[in-house]
């Protein structure tokens, strides 16, 4: 699969994607309004952000009882984003089994031009038909290998090859839990670069659960990554994503060209994105436990909800979720864990 058709300005060293309006949806419990989306897209576009991702936190079709219902239908937000952006491309995420082929077609008709397809890092084969459709439709394609910390670099590279052969033009090492530490990122990115060569680019998506989102992104670029994700003001699941404004500041310092103006993106983060956030994304005990125990970042809000419902500590729920090696889509098992801890508490009292 050639990378010639990828949207990539020759002056860039890496292409940045802002995920505030997708990963940030987890933090906001999927309650974005049209006014918020329009304002954020306009600010990011003006700052020179090449790609802006817009969908429910769990991708196309994610609005559901299991994941949480959207305040505004995601397809309406994709259309609004595409109409608002003057230069930025609009990307959308889909997870096979959550979203459908028809969702991809509708997202494209609403102005989305980059289809990002995510699977668990050992299940790339479930994305084959979706990449095929996306390429048939003329969409640019990106693949997400989620929870990349759970398998070694050489196995991750084999999964990346499956995506690339199916039509994926850039495969991401996705640190869904914010659990990877420096060399762990570099080794995985380097393995993918060696495997894919010129067949596909390699990207990195980080979280701040151990406070390493920016540092890990730098490691990824130095290992050969050409696409990097972040969110303004860390607006994302868990402790949030690598903050775009900080990434741009650091990239400017070390000579990595992105085409994004540091001062404009800092203004966007402070004046436009921050007011749309229900609260700052914190590196608190819950987030740290997720990074330390390797828990999917979107579990945070679900764990807090079950903690309040059953009267058990959220950080204990998250730690046990890590011990059980739960992955995205298994959020409902937090209820079982909460009941288990509740029984243990009652037994200890008797």
UniProtKB/Swiss-Prot annotation:
Active site per database record: 26
Q: Which GO terms describe its molecular function?
A: 2-isopropylmalate synthase activity; 4-hydroxy-2-oxovalerate aldolase activity; manganese ion binding
Q: Give the domain of life.
A: Bacteria
Q: So where does substrate get bound? A: 22-23, 176, 205, 296
Name the EC number(s). 4.1.3.39
UniProt-listed GO biological process terms: catabolic process; L-leucine biosynthetic process
Entry keyword Metal-binding: yes
UniProt: Mn(2+) binding residues: 23, 205, 207
Name of the top EC class for this enzyme: lyase
Provide the site residues for: Transition state stabilizer: 22
Q: Which cysteines are joined by disulfide bonds?
A: none
Concerning its family, UniProt says:
Belongs to the 4-hydroxy-2-oxovalerate aldolase family.
The protein here is known as 4-hydroxy-2-oxovalerate aldolase 3
What species is given as this protein's source?
Mycolicibacterium vanbaalenii (strain DSM 7251 / JCM 13017 / BCRC 16820 / KCTC 9966 / NRRL B-24157 / PYR-1)
